[in-house]
Amino acid sequence: GRLTSHKVFGEAIAILAGDALLTLAFRLVADNASSVKDPRAVGDAVAEIADAAGTAGMVGGQVVDIESEGKTVSAGTLEYIHLHKTAALIRASLRVGARLAGGDAPAVAAISEAGRDLGLAFQIVDDILDVEGSLEQLGKTAGKDQRQRKATYPALHGLEASRREARRLVERVKTRLAGFGERGAPLGALADYVFERKN
């Protein structure tokens, strides 16, 4: 694996890079607005990305994650953290793409649920990698979650149960995509990668 941005450039620059990427998302929507048939869909897309990134999504999940350090949390709190911290943005990205491409309500719903499951699987695997990974694989020091006493799936459920849950979620992503035929294959392959990744 490669060193993470905060290892290469420092924490301040890594945070600014995240800020820049977040604003770039809005720029990309604005730049492509003219290609969308329904102008209201563009406003909806901007609102959805903002919600997923802000206090109703990623920021809100991160706040609960930080506030939970060193505490025993329930399975519900852990799921809240992961669904908001990680899954909200993945779900929103897929939802916005499906809506702007003109997907009907059932297609958008299927993509939304696939995004939710994919985001949750991604975070569970991330938790597992923090336990089992190496600096060479991850690009960052493993074991940080345990040292900070963070709420993680392995800490609450154990490694094997965490692996089973991640695999179950990935399989559910692929089931949700079955109705899309070949158009869903790239996202199914991404789901497999999320489960098999080493960094």
Language model regions located:
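Mg2+-dependent prenyl diphosphate-binding active-site environment of isoprenoid biosynthetic enzymes
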Residues: 1-175, 182-195
